């Protein structure tokens, strides 16, 4: 009887493979599975973010002081000519427009243990579902609030998501947010005054330390937020806004905002150790299933890394330890002539 092939078999392949994450490579190294069976399974099953949420929820260590992080990443498909769901879009890593598949991700951070978990994601494919990245964020937000009911205090997100619609949704739930503003965001110190770019504001020495109250264009009259000027380098200054009007420290705002880089760490790890962006299948369904499996693999690696206090990279590299010892003891290909 043939072994039943499931997505967990594919996950196992992604977990142990070091460089090549193609179905062909999987089939070449499996004694029981052919490429056709693997490809057929990946085109027929329909994995969704629900699988990730269920797996991640059992691993979460929750905190009332928790953080919810939203951001997006692009799976590089610049050499693709026929993969469905690939579109030209801005890549923050590349600092330019590339061909790829966009993913909006959500990460939960426990500041008490300094641990984090990916808890949800959405694939950005407006030609198929008509949804913007902000629509996907709000879908995940509603799931967090009404379905998962995860405890947290603060939301961190990129300037792309600093829209009134998102900010008001967070405020309605009594949560705080910190997010950078684009340098051309229109702002004023008085709702009756003329608006100007946020990067044109003048700052007193005291305001540089404690922030200033501002009004964003299109927000309701009297709706004030706290703005902080964070000097990142000689060539970069961030303007971070929060609805926590009690916040009076630029240094603390910098520390709060720095937590957002946990989601960048997740993106980097997922791409480097799970083959997240390595799928070459043309079918959008196979691509979606591959992404879902890669997410599950990261959750598993993260679980082991937290239990052993190792990094995900060390865990992945450790799979080669036995191979290296054996090859050094008795190499398959010798450096020396017989």
What are these regions (language model features)?
Residues 30-33, 45, 59, 257-260, ...:
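Alpha-helix boundary/capping residues
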Residues 38, 58, 227-230:
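Positively charged, low-complexity intrinsically disordered regions
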Residues 2-3, 7, 12-19, 64, ...:
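Single, function-defining residue in the core of a domain
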Residues 1-48:
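Gly/serine-rich nucleotide phosphate-binding loop at the start of the catalytic core
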């Amino acid at each position: 009887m043939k072994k039943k092939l499931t997505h967990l078999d594919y996950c196992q392949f992604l977990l142990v493979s070091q460089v090549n994450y193609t179905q062909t490579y999987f089939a070449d190294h499996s004694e029981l599975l052919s490429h056709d069976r693997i490809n057929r399974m990946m085109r027929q099953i329909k994995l969704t973010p629900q699988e990730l949420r269920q797996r991640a929820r059992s691993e979460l260590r929750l905190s009332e002081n928790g953080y919810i992080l939203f951001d997006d990443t692009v799976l590089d498909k610049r050499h693709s000519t026929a993969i469905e769901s690939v579109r030209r879009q801005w890549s923050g890593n590349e600092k330019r427009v590339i061909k790829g598949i966009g993913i909006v991700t959500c990460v939960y951070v426990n500041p008490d243990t300094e641990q984090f978990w990916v808890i949800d994601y959405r694939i950005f494919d407006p030609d198929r579902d008509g949804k913007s990245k902000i629509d996907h964020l709000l879908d995940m937000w509603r799931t967090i609030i009404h379905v998962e009911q995860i405890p947290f205090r603060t939301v961190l997100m990129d300037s792309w998501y600093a829209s009134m619609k998102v900010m008001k949704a967070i405020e309605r739930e009594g949560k705080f947010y910190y997010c950078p503003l684009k340098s051309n965001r229109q702002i004023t110190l008085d709702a009756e005054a003329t608006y100007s770019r946020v990067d044109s504001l003048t700052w007193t020495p005291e305001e540089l330390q404690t922030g200033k109250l501002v009004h964003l264009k299109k927000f309701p009259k009297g709706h004030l937020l706290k703005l902080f000027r964070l000097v990142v380098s000689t060539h970069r200054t961030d303007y971070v806004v929060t609805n926590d009007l009690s916040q009076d420290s630029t240094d603390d705002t910098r520390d709060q905002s720095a937590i957002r880089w946990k989601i960048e760490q997740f993106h980097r790890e997922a791409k480097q150790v799970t083959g997240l962006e390595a799928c070459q299948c043309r079918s959008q369904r196979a691509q979606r299933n591959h992404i879902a499996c890669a997410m599950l693999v990261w959750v598993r690696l993260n679980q082991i890394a937290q239990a052993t206090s190792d990094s995900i990279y060390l865990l992945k590299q450790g799979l080669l330890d036995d191979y290296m010892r054996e090859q050094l003891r008795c190499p398959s290909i010798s450096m020396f002539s017989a």
